[in-house]
């Protein structure tokens, strides 16, 4: 059985756990370094990226997670998780886990009040998926080697080797396409 870690600090932790269970995988809440042991993949949920970044540094999780990513462990960042993984945050430097060759802009769609839901066609799935954007970032540039999986004017889902990033919250929908893609296609 595959074991998928979910960083349990902020965001839709419980919602991610439920999606993982629906797919027959075992969720593992990650709050400390020891929780990273024996994971097959890791999800970095949304929340506030600066606060999550401080948590990763203070707990020592940052270096451990980076090592696992460099070793090839699949990782998926949703919303703030995508910001954490970005090599370049527009006008702000890089994310705490700078492994994804994109430029991302924080809160690009506005405040909490500007949150929205949209159906977006995903060629890889050959279906439209529901996407929920809450204070979402916008991917403004992708480097060579980064595959754009879905777009809404600009990329909203990208894949670079073992790194998946979505600027929206798939865990808040009734669908399970993105979790299925991560668990069944990326996690070995």
Curated annotation (Swiss-Prot):
Gene3D superfamilies noted in UniProt: 3.40.50.880
Pathway(s) of this molecule: Cofactor biosynthesis; pyridoxal 5'-phosphate biosynthesis
Keywords: Glutamine amidotransferase, Hydrolase, Lyase, Pyridoxal phosphate
GO cellular component entries: cytosol; glutaminase complex
Keyword Hydrolase: yes
Active site: 79, 169, 171
GO biological process, one term: glutamine catabolic process
InterPro entries tied to this protein: Class_I_gatase-like, PdxT/SNO, PdxT/SNO_CS
EC number, as in UniProt: 4.3.3.6, 3.5.1.2
SUPFAM superfamilies per record: Class I glutamine amidotransferase-like
Catalytic activity reported: aldehydo-D-ribose 5-phosphate + D-glyceraldehyde 3-phosphate + L-glutamine = pyridoxal 5'-phosphate + L-glutamate + phosphate + 3 H2O + H(+); L-glutamine + H2O = L-glutamate + NH4(+)
Annotated residues for binding of L-glutamine: 47-49, 106, 134-135
Keyword field contains Transmembrane: no
Entry GO MF terms: glutaminase activity; pyridoxal 5'-phosphate synthase (glutamine hydrolysing) activity
Pfam family, one: SNO
Function: Catalyzes the hydrolysis of glutamine to glutamate and ammonia as part of the biosynthesis of pyridoxal 5'-phosphate. The resulting ammonia molecule is channeled to the active site of PdxS.
HAMAP family documented for this protein: PdxT (MF_01615)
Family that this chain belongs to: Belongs to the glutaminase PdxT/SNO family.
Quaternary structure annotation from Swiss-Prot or TrEMBL: In the presence of PdxS, forms a dodecamer of heterodimers. Only shows activity in the heterodimer.
Protein name: Pyridoxal 5'-phosphate synthase subunit PdxT
Organism of derivation: Caldicellulosiruptor bescii (strain ATCC BAA-1888 / DSM 6725 / KCTC 15123 / Z-1320)
Organism classification: Bacteria, Bacillati, Bacillota, Bacillota incertae sedis, Caldicellulosiruptorales
Gene: pdxT
